[in-house]
Amino acid sequence: MVHFTAEEKATIMSLWGKVNVEEAGGEALGRLLVVYPWTQRFFDNFGNLSSASAIMGNPKVKAHGKKVLTSFGDAVKNMDNLKGAFAKLSELHCDKLHVDPENFRLLGNVMVIILATHFGKEFTPDVQAAWQKLVSGVATALAHKYH
């Protein structure tokens, strides 16, 4: 279980309140698919994923990215119980979708990059450390159901 200090929680919640979920979600998923092209195999029904510009402009990528980042909001609300908050998604990704759990870590790291680009100087090393801790905790929670 990940333990967050009161300061880390406040830091995460403060920044989360400023995140444009639709924009950042689409960017995060898009970057994941571009930088780690083997992840595209889970999205074969998304249409044209042939180039970086096609991926970043793909409406299905943007919509699913928003969905992913919206569910990430559950992590912000449930920092003290990430495993419980992501139990159903862990089961879905393990048993039905068969997603390699390493992809959760990759997506978390991409999210940190997106937040850094969106918030610039406001994304200090302390802010990054808190967010890195959160995305790592989410990746671990999502991988929980894997055998």
Curated annotation (Swiss-Prot):
One of its GO terms (cellular component) is blood microparticle. Gene3D superfamilies: Globins. The keyword Phosphoprotein applies. Heme b binds at H64, H93. The keyword Secreted does not apply. GO terms for molecular function: haptoglobin binding; heme binding; hemoglobin alpha binding; metal ion binding; organic acid binding; oxygen binding; oxygen carrier activity; peroxidase activity. Heterotetramer of two alpha chains and two epsilon chains in early embryonic hemoglobin Gower-2; two zeta chains and two epsilon chains in early embryonic hemoglobin Gower-1. This is Hemoglobin subunit epsilon.
